[in-house]
Regions:
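Bacterial N-terminal signal peptides that target proteins for export
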Residues: 1-15
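Hydrophobic alpha-helical transmembrane segments of integral membrane proteins
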Residues: 16, 20-21, 213
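Hydrophobic beta-strand scaffold residues
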Residues: 72, 98, 164-165, 230
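Sec-dependent signal peptide cleavage junction
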Residues: 20-40
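Catalytic domains of cell-wall/extracellular-matrix polysaccharide-remodeling enzymes
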Residues: 105-224, 228, 236, 243
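Hydrophobic pocket-lining residues within nucleotide cofactor-binding pockets
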Residues: 16, 81, 170
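Active-site beta->alpha N-cap acidic-glycine motif
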Residues: 33-131, 135, 222
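C-terminal domain-boundary segment and adjacent tail
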Residues: 36, 40, 68-72, 80-82, ...
Length: 247
Protein backbone atom coordinates (compact mmCIF):
# COMPACT_ATOMS: atom_id res chain seq x y z
CA UNK A 1 0.00 0.00 0.00
CA UNK A 2 2.81 2.35 0.92
CA UNK A 3 4.54 1.48 -2.33
CA UNK A 4 1.43 2.36 -4.31
CA UNK A 5 1.15 5.74 -2.54
CA UNK A 6 4.74 6.58 -3.32
CA UNK A 7 4.23 5.65 -6.96
CA UNK A 8 1.10 7.81 -7.22
CA UNK A 9 2.86 10.73 -5.54
CA UNK A 10 5.81 10.48 -7.91
CA UNK A 11 3.55 10.22 -10.97
CA UNK A 12 1.51 13.23 -9.85
CA UNK A 13 4.67 15.29 -9.34
CA UNK A 14 5.90 14.41 -12.82
CA UNK A 15 2.56 15.33 -14.37
CA UNK A 16 2.59 18.69 -12.60
CA UNK A 17 6.13 19.46 -13.71
CA UNK A 18 5.67 18.19 -17.29
CA UNK A 19 4.09 21.38 -18.75
CA UNK A 20 6.79 23.49 -17.13
CA UNK A 21 9.45 21.70 -19.15
CA UNK A 22 8.07 23.29 -22.31
CA UNK A 23 7.66 26.81 -21.01
CA UNK A 24 11.28 27.86 -21.53
CA UNK A 25 11.29 26.41 -25.05
CA UNK A 26 8.03 28.14 -25.93
CA UNK A 27 9.19 31.42 -24.45
CA UNK A 28 12.52 31.15 -26.26
CA UNK A 29 10.81 30.41 -29.57
CA UNK A 30 8.44 33.35 -29.13
CA UNK A 31 11.28 35.69 -28.22
CA UNK A 32 13.34 34.51 -31.19
CA UNK A 33 10.37 35.05 -33.51
CA UNK A 34 9.81 38.54 -32.12
CA UNK A 35 13.50 39.40 -32.48
CA UNK A 36 13.46 38.18 -36.08
CA UNK A 37 10.38 40.26 -36.92
CA UNK A 38 11.86 43.34 -35.26
CA UNK A 39 15.15 42.83 -37.08
CA UNK A 40 13.35 42.62 -40.42
CA UNK A 41 11.30 45.73 -39.66
CA UNK A 42 14.42 47.70 -38.77
CA UNK A 43 16.50 46.36 -41.66
CA UNK A 44 17.95 48.86 -44.11
CA UNK A 45 16.67 47.42 -47.38
CA UNK A 46 17.88 48.64 -50.77
CA UNK A 47 17.02 47.58 -54.31
CA UNK A 48 19.78 47.73 -56.92
CA UNK A 49 18.61 47.63 -60.53
CA UNK A 50 20.33 47.47 -63.91
CA UNK A 51 18.84 48.51 -67.26
CA UNK A 52 19.63 47.69 -70.90
CA UNK A 53 21.18 44.26 -70.43
CA UNK A 54 22.28 41.71 -70.87
CA UNK A 55 25.45 42.85 -72.63
CA UNK A 56 29.00 41.66 -73.24
CA UNK A 57 29.80 43.01 -69.76
CA UNK A 58 27.10 41.18 -67.81
CA UNK A 59 29.40 38.32 -66.86
CA UNK A 60 31.84 40.65 -65.10
CA UNK A 61 28.96 42.53 -63.49
CA UNK A 62 27.60 39.26 -62.09
CA UNK A 63 31.06 38.34 -60.84
CA UNK A 64 31.21 41.58 -58.86
CA UNK A 65 27.74 41.03 -57.40
CA UNK A 66 28.72 37.51 -56.40
CA UNK A 67 31.95 38.74 -54.82
CA UNK A 68 30.00 41.08 -52.55
CA UNK A 69 27.13 38.61 -52.00
CA UNK A 70 24.63 41.03 -53.51
CA UNK A 71 21.47 40.34 -55.49
CA UNK A 72 20.11 42.85 -58.00
CA UNK A 73 17.21 43.16 -60.44
CA UNK A 74 17.81 43.29 -64.19
CA UNK A 75 15.40 45.07 -66.55
CA UNK A 76 16.33 43.45 -69.84
CA UNK A 77 15.74 44.09 -73.53
CA UNK A 78 14.28 41.30 -75.66
CA UNK A 79 16.94 41.30 -78.43
CA UNK A 80 19.73 41.41 -75.84
CA UNK A 81 18.36 38.37 -74.03
CA UNK A 82 18.41 36.43 -77.28
CA UNK A 83 21.88 37.67 -78.20
CA UNK A 84 23.44 37.01 -74.78
CA UNK A 85 21.63 33.85 -73.80
CA UNK A 86 24.26 32.51 -71.40
CA UNK A 87 24.24 35.78 -69.47
CA UNK A 88 20.43 35.68 -69.30
CA UNK A 89 20.46 32.13 -68.01
CA UNK A 90 23.10 33.00 -65.43
CA UNK A 91 21.04 35.94 -64.13
CA UNK A 92 18.13 33.57 -63.60
CA UNK A 93 20.23 30.75 -62.16
CA UNK A 94 21.95 32.99 -59.60
CA UNK A 95 18.65 34.24 -58.22
CA UNK A 96 18.61 37.84 -59.39
CA UNK A 97 15.36 39.72 -59.96
CA UNK A 98 13.89 39.70 -63.46
CA UNK A 99 12.30 42.64 -65.25
CA UNK A 100 11.50 43.67 -68.81
CA UNK A 101 12.69 46.82 -70.57
CA UNK A 102 10.97 46.34 -73.91
CA UNK A 103 12.45 45.65 -77.34
CA UNK A 104 13.44 48.80 -79.25
CA UNK A 105 14.33 51.28 -76.48
CA UNK A 106 13.18 53.98 -78.91
CA UNK A 107 10.58 56.40 -77.45
CA UNK A 108 9.01 57.06 -80.85
CA UNK A 109 8.33 53.35 -81.26
CA UNK A 110 7.65 52.19 -77.72
CA UNK A 111 5.25 55.06 -76.93
CA UNK A 112 3.74 55.27 -80.40
CA UNK A 113 0.36 54.06 -79.13
CA UNK A 114 -1.26 52.65 -76.03
CA UNK A 115 -0.67 49.15 -77.34
CA UNK A 116 2.82 49.46 -78.82
CA UNK A 117 4.43 49.35 -75.38
CA UNK A 118 2.31 46.37 -74.36
CA UNK A 119 3.37 44.52 -77.49
CA UNK A 120 7.04 45.18 -76.77
CA UNK A 121 6.81 43.97 -73.18
CA UNK A 122 4.96 40.83 -74.21
CA UNK A 123 7.54 40.17 -76.89
CA UNK A 124 10.39 40.68 -74.40
CA UNK A 125 8.68 38.27 -72.00
CA UNK A 126 8.53 35.66 -74.74
CA UNK A 127 12.26 36.13 -75.33
CA UNK A 128 12.93 35.59 -71.62
CA UNK A 129 10.77 32.48 -71.63
CA UNK A 130 12.42 31.15 -74.78
CA UNK A 131 15.94 31.61 -73.41
CA UNK A 132 15.52 30.84 -69.71
CA UNK A 133 12.14 29.16 -69.37
CA UNK A 134 10.66 31.82 -67.08
CA UNK A 135 8.49 34.92 -67.32
CA UNK A 136 8.10 38.05 -65.22
CA UNK A 137 5.45 40.71 -64.60
CA UNK A 138 7.90 43.49 -63.68
CA UNK A 139 8.60 46.22 -66.23
CA UNK A 140 10.52 49.45 -66.58
CA UNK A 141 9.73 51.52 -69.64
CA UNK A 142 12.50 53.18 -71.72
CA UNK A 143 13.81 56.44 -70.16
CA UNK A 144 11.37 56.07 -67.28
CA UNK A 145 7.60 56.29 -67.30
CA UNK A 146 7.25 60.07 -67.07
CA UNK A 147 6.21 61.98 -69.11
CA UNK A 148 5.78 59.39 -71.86
CA UNK A 149 3.53 56.80 -70.24
CA UNK A 150 0.17 58.58 -70.24
CA UNK A 151 -2.71 57.28 -68.08
CA UNK A 152 -4.35 55.47 -71.00
CA UNK A 153 -1.05 53.78 -71.82
CA UNK A 154 -0.57 52.73 -68.20
CA UNK A 155 -4.05 51.27 -68.05
CA UNK A 156 -3.24 49.04 -71.00
CA UNK A 157 0.15 47.93 -69.67
CA UNK A 158 -0.85 47.46 -66.05
CA UNK A 159 -4.52 46.64 -66.51
CA UNK A 160 -4.75 44.48 -69.61
CA UNK A 161 -1.12 43.41 -69.53
CA UNK A 162 -1.04 42.67 -65.81
CA UNK A 163 2.43 44.17 -65.47
CA UNK A 164 3.89 46.04 -62.48
CA UNK A 165 5.61 49.34 -63.32
CA UNK A 166 8.95 50.28 -61.78
CA UNK A 167 10.97 53.48 -62.04
CA UNK A 168 13.56 54.56 -59.44
CA UNK A 169 14.25 57.13 -56.74
CA UNK A 170 18.06 57.05 -56.91
CA UNK A 171 19.60 57.88 -60.30
CA UNK A 172 23.31 57.09 -60.52
CA UNK A 173 23.61 58.85 -63.90
CA UNK A 174 26.23 56.24 -64.78
CA UNK A 175 25.21 56.54 -68.44
CA UNK A 176 26.13 60.24 -68.39
CA UNK A 177 29.33 60.22 -66.32
CA UNK A 178 31.02 57.18 -67.80
CA UNK A 179 34.49 58.50 -67.05
CA UNK A 180 33.75 60.30 -63.80
CA UNK A 181 33.35 57.38 -61.41
CA UNK A 182 33.52 59.57 -58.32
CA UNK A 183 30.56 61.59 -59.60
CA UNK A 184 28.53 58.42 -60.03
CA UNK A 185 29.51 57.22 -56.56
CA UNK A 186 28.56 60.56 -55.01
CA UNK A 187 25.23 60.57 -56.86
CA UNK A 188 24.30 57.19 -55.46
CA UNK A 189 25.38 57.79 -51.88
CA UNK A 190 23.88 61.28 -51.55
CA UNK A 191 20.55 60.25 -53.04
CA UNK A 192 20.38 57.06 -50.98
CA UNK A 193 20.89 59.09 -47.82
CA UNK A 194 18.23 61.61 -48.86
CA UNK A 195 15.70 58.92 -49.75
CA UNK A 196 16.33 57.08 -46.50
CA UNK A 197 15.80 60.28 -44.49
CA UNK A 198 12.37 60.54 -46.11
CA UNK A 199 11.54 57.08 -44.81
CA UNK A 200 11.55 55.51 -48.27
CA UNK A 201 13.35 52.41 -49.49
CA UNK A 202 16.03 53.29 -52.09
CA UNK A 203 15.62 51.91 -55.62
CA UNK A 204 18.90 52.53 -57.43
CA UNK A 205 19.14 52.87 -61.21
CA UNK A 206 22.35 51.74 -62.88
CA UNK A 207 23.15 50.33 -66.32
CA UNK A 208 24.63 47.09 -67.58
CA UNK A 209 27.68 48.68 -69.20
CA UNK A 210 31.46 48.63 -68.97
CA UNK A 211 31.77 52.00 -67.21
CA UNK A 212 29.56 50.84 -64.35
CA UNK A 213 31.95 47.99 -63.58
CA UNK A 214 34.56 50.54 -62.52
CA UNK A 215 32.46 52.14 -59.79
CA UNK A 216 30.19 49.28 -58.71
CA UNK A 217 32.60 47.72 -56.17
CA UNK A 218 33.05 51.07 -54.43
CA UNK A 219 29.28 51.57 -54.24
CA UNK A 220 28.58 48.08 -52.93
CA UNK A 221 31.33 48.26 -50.34
CA UNK A 222 30.07 51.61 -49.02
CA UNK A 223 26.42 50.59 -48.86
CA UNK A 224 27.19 47.31 -47.14
CA UNK A 225 29.37 49.15 -44.63
CA UNK A 226 26.33 51.29 -43.80
CA UNK A 227 24.32 48.16 -43.09
CA UNK A 228 22.17 47.98 -46.22
CA UNK A 229 20.69 44.64 -47.23
CA UNK A 230 20.25 44.12 -50.97
CA UNK A 231 17.00 42.49 -52.00
CA UNK A 232 15.40 41.77 -55.37
CA UNK A 233 12.18 43.18 -56.75
CA UNK A 234 9.28 40.76 -57.05
CA UNK A 235 5.58 41.01 -57.84
CA UNK A 236 4.95 41.12 -54.08
CA UNK A 237 6.94 44.32 -53.57
CA UNK A 238 4.88 47.51 -53.90
CA UNK A 239 6.03 49.29 -57.09
CA UNK A 240 7.91 52.58 -56.97
CA UNK A 241 7.20 54.70 -60.02
CA UNK A 242 6.86 58.34 -61.01
CA UNK A 243 3.05 58.13 -61.16
CA UNK A 244 2.65 56.57 -57.72
CA UNK A 245 0.66 53.82 -59.44
CA UNK A 246 0.65 50.85 -57.05
CA UNK A 247 -0.74 48.28 -59.47
Amino acid sequence: MLHIRKTLTTTLAILLLFPLLFLPLSATATAASADKAASKANAKIIYLTFDDGPTAHTGKLLDILDQYKVKATFFMLGPHMEQYQQATKRIVKEGHGLGLHGVTHVPGKFYKSAYSGLKEMQQANESLNKVAGVKTSLIRTPYGSKPYLKPAYRNVLLGQGGFHLWDWNVDSLDWKYKKDHQKVYNNVMQQVHNVKKQGTTPVVLMHDQEATLKVLPQVLKALKAEGYQFEILTKNVQPVNFWNDKR
